[in-house]
Amino acid sequence: MEKIVNLKEIRKGGSLSFEYKGQKAILIRTKKGDLLGYIAVCPHEGGDIEWDEQINMILCECHLSLFNVQDGSVYRHSSLFELNQGLTKIDLEVDKNNDIYLAQKSR
């Protein structure tokens, strides 16, 4: 298994970029401590996404689309286009040493 990071290396409210199957990905640790992983590409036009800790949302700066952090669903998008598809979630596992890995079914 390929370790992504140890839990102590990512603060609550922080995020970390990593590569997943040749694509940009993001690991988010919410202020509550939840660990969430997503392909870091907006489903609209492939723009980069970023975690915005202040608003507790994932943001695509290209058209200011917002995605729910808990499930990657579309929260808000521009009225200029239709966006029905949310972000692709990546399942994660944490071992007894607090190392974070891709879950078996994500590999």
What do these predicted regions represent?
Residues 1-54, 73, 86-107:
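N-terminal pre-ligand scaffold of iron-sulfur
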Residues 45-47, 63-66:
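Active-site glycine-rich loops that stabilize anionic/oxyanionic intermediates
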Residues 56-64, 74-83:
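Short cysteine/histidine-rich metal-coordination sites, predominantly Zn2+-binding motifs
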Residues 15-19, 66, 80:
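Intrinsic disorder/low-structure terminal segments
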